[in-house]
Amino acid sequence: MTQSNLYIPSRGDIVYLDFDPTKGHEKKGLRPAFVLSPRAYNEKSSLALFMPITKQQKGYPFEVSLPTGLKVQGVILADKIKCLDWKFRGVRFVESVSEDVIEEVPIKIEPLLL
């Protein structure tokens, strides 16, 4: 893949990427993830903030439900933020979510940060 057609993750995208290596209870393997960080940061640093997505909805306060009709179904685990090198993790774009979902994510993580 050449630099000119390289996909750059953007806030609100759902992507697949490899979370391995991991330890303990961390989400692992090739899985869907929500992109939290803005495209400008992701492009400049080759890093991005990702939140794994799981089909196992458990009702935890940090889950953000994905609306029906998307290719990826489940919940964003907003408390599992990871900063990863997306170029080396084999990131693949799937789809983008609505502004409603993008706006709900920071609301869910605010109690962890303040």
Name these PLM-found stretches:
Residues M1-L114:
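Conserved functional hotspots at enzyme active or ligand-binding sites that engage polyanionic ligands
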